[in-house]
Swiss-Prot record:
Keywords: Chromosome, Developmental protein, Differentiation, Disulfide bond, DNA condensation, DNA-binding, Nucleosome core, Nucleus, Phosphoprotein, Spermatogenesis
Gene of this entry: Prm1
Family: Belongs to the protamine P1 family.
Protein name as catalogued: Sperm protamine P1
Tissue expression as described in the entry: Testis.
Amino acid sequence: MARYRCCRSKSRSRCRRRRRRCRRRRRRCCRRRRRRCCRRRRSYTIRCKKY
């Protein structure tokens, strides 16, 4: 199975589907690693990327 990590890519449609919301605030996590959350920033959102 593919693993995912957080990245700062804007155009990643694949990442959008595999993001999950974290319990803490509005942060979103990667499917495989729930501990690492993607934070929302001003101009972009950090998303999950395959590695």
